[in-house]
């Protein structure tokens, strides 16, 4: 099953997440099909905290991909801001 989820990157105590489309059987930070955005929970000042390509997310959801709980909330927030 294909899922859209967060892949953690960044340094210790400084998380940075890539929003990726991946097979659910793969490791969370491993192989992925496509990167559709990023999420920086520690963004300050003028730093961009969230960027999601909503067209690609909608494409993958139309193809049957499922969203993780956190990504679903982030997509909802991005749609509200757009």
Swiss-Prot record:
Record-given protein name: Small ribosomal subunit protein bS16
Family of this protein: Belongs to the bacterial ribosomal protein bS16 family.
Record flagged with keyword Ion transport: no
Pfam families in the cross-refs: Ribosomal_S16 (PF00886)
Domain of life from the UniProt record: Bacteria
InterPro entries named in the record: Ribosomal_bS16, Ribosomal_bS16_CS, Ribosomal_bS16_dom_sf
One GO cellular component term noted in the UniProt record for this chain: small ribosomal subunit
Swiss-Prot/TrEMBL keywords: Ribonucleoprotein, Ribosomal protein
Biological process terms in GO annotation: translation
NCBIfam families in UniProt: S16
UniProt-recorded Gene Ontology molecular function terms: structural constituent of ribosome
Source organism: Vibrio vulnificus (strain YJ016)
